C-alpha cells in the first residue's frame, strides 16, 4: 500500500516533532543538571550527533523510497535536510559561544584553520548552508541542471561529517565509528549512481 499525499503531510508533522523534541530534552538536561561534569562538551556532542542523525536520515530517504516503492516519501527529504542544517548550526554555535566564548569569537577563524577536524566541520556546514539556501523549488528552477550538481555535494558532507566526528573525539568510542559505517553503507547504496558520473 502506497502512502498518500495526506499521509505524507502527517508524516512531515511527526518529523518536525522529531526534529524539535531533542531541543526540548537538551533544555531540560541543562536546567535539571542532567549533563556530565563537562556540559559544554555534552552540548557540542549532542547537537553534532543529532545533526548527523538527520543527515543519515536524509540520505536514507531515496533508497527507502525506491526499495519500498513509496515515491511520495521523497517529499520528506527536504524537511530532514533542513533539520540537519538546524542542528549543525546549533553545533557550530555551541562551539563558538560556549567553547570559545563571545569575547573570543575573533579566534574562530584561526581555530578553524589550525585544527583540521574543525576545518572539515566548517566545510560541511558551509555545504549544508548552500544546500539549504537552494532547497526551494524557485532555486531549483533558476539553477536548472546545476541544481542537481550542487545538491550532490551532500555526498561530500556524508564523508566529511563522520570524519569530523571521528577526529574530534580524544578517545575512540563505538559511536563515531557506527555513524561513519552507516554513512558508508548509505553511500554504497548509490554505487551505480556514482559509476554513472564517471561515464
From Swiss-Prot:
One of its GO terms (molecular function) is oxidoreductase activity, acting on diphenols and related substances as donors. Pfam families: Ferric_reduct. InterPro entries: Fe3_Rdtase_TM_dom, MsrQ-like. The chain crosses the membrane at residues 8-28, 82-102, 116-136, 153-173. GO terms for cellular component: plasma membrane. It comes from the Bacteria. Its cofactor is FMN; heme b. One of its GO terms (biological process) is protein repair. It is found in: Cell inner membrane. Keywords: Cell inner membrane, Cell membrane, Electron transport, Flavoprotein, FMN, Heme, Iron, Membrane, Metal-binding, Transmembrane, Transmembrane helix, Transport. It is a multi-pass membrane protein. Binds 1 FMN per subunit. Binds 1 heme b (iron(II)-protoporphyrin IX) group per subunit. NCBIfam families: PRK05419.1-2, PRK05419.1-4. Heterodimer of a catalytic subunit (MsrP) and a heme-binding subunit (MsrQ). Belongs to the MsrQ family. Part of the MsrPQ system that repairs oxidized periplasmic proteins containing methionine sulfoxide residues (Met-O), using respiratory chain electrons. Thus protects these proteins from oxidative-stress damage caused by reactive species of oxygen and chlorine generated by the host defense mechanisms. MsrPQ is essential for the maintenance of envelope integrity under bleach stress, rescuing a wide series of structurally unrelated periplasmic proteins from methionine oxidation, including the primary periplasmic chaperone SurA and the lipoprotein Pal. This is Protein-methionine-sulfoxide reductase heme-binding subunit MsrQ. It comes from Salmonella arizonae (strain ATCC BAA-731 / CDC346-86 / RSK2980).
Amino acid at each position: 500500500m502506497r502512502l498518500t499525499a495526506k499521509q505524507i503531510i502527517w508524516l512531515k508533522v511527526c518529523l518536525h516533532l522529531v526534529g524539535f523534541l531533542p531541543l526540548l530534552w537538551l533544555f531540560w538536561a541543562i536546567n535539571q543538571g542532567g549533563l556530565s561534569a563537562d556540559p559544554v562538551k555534552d552540548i557540542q556532542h549532542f547537537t553534532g550527533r543529532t545533526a548527523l542523525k538527520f543527515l543519515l536520515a536524509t540520505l536514507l530517504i531515496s533508497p527507502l523510497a525506491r526499495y519500498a516503492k513509496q515515491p511520495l516519501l521523497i517529499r520528506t527529504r527536504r524537511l530532514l535536510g533542513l533539520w540537519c542544517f538546524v542542528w549543525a548550526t546549533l553545533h557550530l554555535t555551541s562551539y563558538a559561544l560556549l567553547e570559545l566564548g563571545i569575547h573570543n569569537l575573533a579566534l574562530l577563524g584561526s581555530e578553524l584553520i589550525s585544527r583540521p577536524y574543525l576545518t572539515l566541520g566548517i566545510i560541511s556546514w558551509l555545504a549544508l548552508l548552500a544546500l539549504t539556501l537552494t532547497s526551494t523549488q524557485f532555486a531549483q528552477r533558476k539553477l536548472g541542471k546545476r541544481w542537481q550538481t550542487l545538491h550532490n555535494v551532500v555526498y561530500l558532507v556524508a564523508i566529511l561529517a563522520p570524519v569530523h566526528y571521528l577526529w574530534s573525539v580524544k578517545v575512540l568510542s563505538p559511536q563515531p565509528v557506527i555513524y561513519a559505517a552507516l554513512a558508508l553503507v548509505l553511500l554504497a547504496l548509490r554505487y551505480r549512481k556514482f559509476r554513472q558520473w564517471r561515464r
